[in-house]
């Protein structure tokens, strides 16, 4: 959650948008100082212009970013003015809310406050990025600026005092901008993330990129200074006119005042917004449809009507969502990805992709069910990867069937208990996942391992368990086993609202406790016999919300009826 913490000095982007370098891959333009330097050093024009479309100008401490939080130069000026002239508790409430928002957005840079909110304030730990709390400041700062304008329009402050406070607010905001416009070189424009690329380019290009960062600060500092000066002039003009000529064309003056400010704010904000969310980010409907058009490899895979998963090696596996459009993907991207699944990607899946590709190349896409081959990517087999999509020449893709996929569920002979999650994760590449499972010792009771009355776990040729029906929120299985056995389900374990039942012929349900094995998967002890199993997702929060909504609607109807009935009786 703290990976996207807003830097303390990065807060200057409220006032100077490109203070921190804009975005991770920023388009500095063909007319930039960097582009000219590259051409002067013999780089072909086209290559220089292409490079300048994706320059590592961002110098903050986030892994990457698509743009800064820019409040607006005029908004910052009005906010500071509001702190000086707005009386009463509203000012202090808005100031405290703004400061809290900024402090929480700092995340790991103010860890004691972040940990306090993360651990003790409900729902706060659901935020993916702590900097998203800056939406509060994006409301409170303009709101205090509006209250400042109200003070000026309503003439609730003496002209001399107002003029002095206007110069103070303008001096603080415009003064900061002017200082960095004149002395931008005093800012350290290096970053700890520069090590990822700085040794891969010549020294002159490295220095040119650093100079471009400085130039970006200087240009935007001048820009903000000019907008503050213009905003100051408009506010000063209106306040001066209202005090020296209070009755002359007052309504038209007010319209001109608000109109001029609105135009200036839009002129300030819109160009900055378009830097990071411009016309290039919009896609035509026909282009979007073409992106999701059925591919030959998808047609081939979809002929298989069994239940399986696919790993797409022909794309950016863990940052691509297209594969999941038609296929059940092991990869893909989600902002709400479970941490344990990300661990599985980092520690196993990403490391098994290269051996998988080597096996595909060695077998020329025809993998035979040889036990020794499948041992190179056991976790992918555990996740029921029946197909791998591999790249071909000419930008095409082809599916390769994996005969080592372990299926949707299976019985194991032994469950190994460990003390820590690290041990559990590490053992996945060491044990035989077909016959063994590894679990945290806190699940020992749920797996019935510690209960002496349970028959020792053994595997029989007669034992079988298979998935018979699939839906995202309901999976049905059929099991046949002569003794109590641990079944491992190739489904990601989630501790809330998932329930496993044995369904008898008369429809009665008996719940079985679910446990976590193999770091991420679900497991349960299946009693001896022939059973129909149902695994259902039953979110209690949604059910509770439905009842609450029904009660509220009923209460609303009764209230409306109680209010209208006397009127109806009186009219009758």
Kindly label every feature range from the protein language model.
Residues 1-56, 391, 402-468, 474, ...:
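Soluble non-transmembrane domains of integral membrane proteins
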Residues 1-82, 183-225:
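Periplasmic/ER-lumenal interhelical loops and adjacent helix-loop junctions
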Residues 7, 19-24, 261-292, 296-380, ...:
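Extracytoplasmic/lumenal acceptor-recognition loop(s) of multi-pass membrane glycoenzymes
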Residues 77, 331, 386, 395, ...:
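Active-site-proximal, structured, solvent-exposed surfaces of multi-pass membrane proteins
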Residues 86-294, 400, 526-572:
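Contiguous transmembrane helix-bundle modules in multi-pass membrane proteins
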Residues 61, 77-87, 236, 291-300, ...:
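Short alpha-helical segments and helix-capping/turn motifs at coil-helix boundaries
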Residues 44-56, 74, 110-121, 203-209, ...:
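Active-site-adjacent bridging/hinge elements
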